[in-house]
Amino acid sequence: MLCVGTIAFFLYTFYDKKLDASLDAEGLEPEEPFRMKDIVYIITNKGFWLIALLCVLFYSAVFPFIKYAADLMVQKYNVDPKLAGTIPGLLPIGAIILTPLFGSLYDRIGKGATLMIIGSVMLIFVHTMFALPILNIWWFATIIMIILGFAFSLVPSAMWPAFPKIIPEKQLGTAYALIFWVQNWGLMGVPLLIGWVLNTYCKGPVVDGAQTYDYTLPMAIFALFGVLALIVALMLKAENKKKGYGLEEANIQK
């Protein structure tokens, strides 16, 4: 994968230079160069921070969860360790199918901020169900994982198309770099937090030479991230109404 990515980078660089040369030959103005004041504009934009916070909170409740999901299936739902990765594996498979569908839905009907709110509510529901000591059966875990797949597809399909409506096009590349920087802090810190919580507060007895864990507290933490994501999504909808970003408007105008 790294080799393919490296090849893609060189191809992109080649065609980007070719495009610049073509624009020069046609006498068209090149893109505006990067300026430090662009960063200042972006980080003083409240809409940017709301999207960035929603991004880091939402993904922090999904990707780190996937890291521990297989063990959760074994510890709580008594799934065979050889099959434990199958249920969490439904998440990315579902996202491949659902994300384009939800993206098309957003293009046609709009309601981007509303879709992000709905996805955040679904995220809270999923992690609350995983935290509660009810129905510790594999098929229940499968249903909950499918619902998480819907949320995992719904929020990004509305969040990423909404981003260019908040940030001017000439600053969009810088804004994407900043939002991924913020996101990666969360993706770095949350697994460390969950691992520390498990080792400090959630250890159970050793069974057949293997350490057991109670995942109630980690799932409650993930649910808390969902609650915070919901609050931010509601704030984003209010900011959209105030600033007129057009997040609730369809991208395809009839």
Predicted segments with their positions:
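A membrane-interface helix-boundary motif in multi-pass transporters
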Residues: 1, 196-226
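Extracytoplasmic gate region of multi-pass secondary transporters
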Residues: 45-96, 156, 160, 190-191
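Helix-to-loop junctions at the C-terminal end of transmembrane segments
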Residues: 98-111, 198
